[in-house]
């Protein structure tokens, strides 16, 4: 993401805390964020407290936010969208039923996890017990390698952007095997 866009998002959020990893810490420092910075590795090392977790679970309701995502913004200004638990649960119930996704499936994830399309892959896997196989982005430049990968991983379900399917089709990837 360009620094200007990230700064716009930070201005909109007015966040007091950001969770990051070592990989992005220097980028965050360049943006001039003045709030508290928590390192993901440190949070992962904290021992879980079952009592606190139970208290939080008891307070949660289905309309609580599950995630927030920023759109590209047709005006050039990013717009934040907050999606609640109930919205995702209802959608995934219908989606997995419609496409008959079960614990026997292997879902080939093409969409980045910071893009809302990945919700179908992530939560279909969580709901049904299906395996979610992350497909390395570089394979989309080599259709035969991509097809080999899908066959080797026994991928049964693809929820892809049309552009990804078009690339494979244009390069005759579906006729490969």
Where are each of the predicted segments found?
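Conserved AMP-binding/adenylation subdomain of ANL enzymes
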Residues: 79-108, 116-157
């Amino acid at each position: 993401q360009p620094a200007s866009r990230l700064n716009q998002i930070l201005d909109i959020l007015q966040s007091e805390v950001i969770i990051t990893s070592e990989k992005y810490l220097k980028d965050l420092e360049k943006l001039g964020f003045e709030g508290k910075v928590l390192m993901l590795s440190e949070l992962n090392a904290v021992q879980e407290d079952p009592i606190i977790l139970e208290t939080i679970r008891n307070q949660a309701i289905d309309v609580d936010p599950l995630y927030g995502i920023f759109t590209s913004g047709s005006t050039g200004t990013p717009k934040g969208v907050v999606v609640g638990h109930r919205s995702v649960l209802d959608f995934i119930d219908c989606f997995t039923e419609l496409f008959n996704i079960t614990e026997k499936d292997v879902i080939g994830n093409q969409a980045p996890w910071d893009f809302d399309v990945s919700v179908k892959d992530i939560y279909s896997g969580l709901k049904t017990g299906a395996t979610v196989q992350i497909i390395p982005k570089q394979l989309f430049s080599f259709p035969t390698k991509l097809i080999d990968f899908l066959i080797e991983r026994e991928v049964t379900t693809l929820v892809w952007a049309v552009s990804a399917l078009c690339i494979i089709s244009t390069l005759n990837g579906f006729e490969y095997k």
